[in-house]
A protein has these predicted regions:
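Short, solvent-exposed loop/turn and secondary-structure capping segments
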Residues: 74-77, 162-166
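Active-site helix/loop module of the DD-peptidase/beta-lactamase fold
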Residues: 92-94, 98, 106-107, 111, ...
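Short, conserved catalytic-motif segment at the N-terminal edge
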Residues: 35-102, 126
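Cytochrome P450 catalytic-core helices
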Residues: 114
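Short glycine/proline-rich turn/loop motifs
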Residues: 24-31, 87-98, 182-187
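Cytochrome P450
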Residues: 190-199
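Short, compositionally biased leader-like segments
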Residues: 2-42
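Short, charged, amphipathic alpha-helices and their helix-cap/turn boundaries
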Residues: 85-90, 166-189, 214-218
Length: 218
């Protein structure tokens, strides 16, 4: 049955003893009543997380929930490795914890957009300005007029990196930025939408860094 779940349905195996794969950082979690919530509210949220985990779609789920700046939930369920559909039976199982790094990618787009609008509210940027106004090197290869707004709206004309770029390069922000500065836009018609799945975040991060001197990952 486990073989069918993994190889046919591409699902993770769910242990009978769920407590054995749950990690709760009790030292970080505050009493929910201190921020106007009930214990029942937290229990309901966590019960729904468990329901999602029990589908087997995700080998691990981590939850970090804050209210009024205080941590209400800092929890994890499942395995960081060893129980995924592609893992071999002899792969050592490693429990996920609240500290386990998770690759967010598009989930972080909302955070980046909020930061850009906060900078705009503070008068540090204008989203209608060209990216090159803040990062002149971005103007290479005909990108001098591409605006921050166009990048936010996935209309910047640079939806992807060159095909021969190694995924490992994405861990090097400076190297990726240099690639983006040297890439030619595939279109200049801002009415055309092309999802900037990866590229937009690197461009906006660089604007944030140029304006504030801070790294978005700091």
């Amino acid at each position: 049955m486990e073989i069918i779940r993994k190889q046919v349905l591409h699902l993770s195996a769910i242990p009978r003893d769920l407590d054995s794969v749950i990690t709760i950082d009790s030292a970080k979690e505050v009493d929910p009543q201190s921020v106007g919530m009930l214990h029942a509210d937290v229990d309901k949220i966590w019960d729904n997380v468990i329901k999602v985990y029990k589908t087997g779609v995700h080998p691990a789920i981590t939850v970090s929930l804050r209210r009024q700046g205080k941590v209400i939930m800092s929890r994890a369920i499942g395995h960081a490795r060893g129980n995924g559909p592609a893992d071999h039976a002899n792969t050592p199982k490693e429990l996920a914890t609240p500290e386990t790094p998770m690759c967010l990618f598009s989930t972080s787009k909302a955070v980046t957009a909020v930061l850009m609008h906060m900078l705009a509210e503070d008068g540090l940027i204008n989203v209608m300005d060209p990216v090159s106004f803040y990062a002149p090197e971005f103007a290479r290869k005909g990108k001098g007029n591409i605006t921050i707004h166009q990048i936010l709206a996935h209309r910047g004309g640079i939806p992807g990196l060159p095909k021969n770029v190694s995924l490992d390069t994405l861990w090097d922000e400076d190297a990726t930025w240099e690639l983006l500065c040297n890439v030619e836009p595939i279109m200049t018609d801002v009415s055309k939408l092309a999802y900037h799945a990866i590229t937009g975040g690197f461009v906006l991060e660089r604007v944030i860094r140029k304006v504030t001197g801070e790294n978005i990952n700091a």
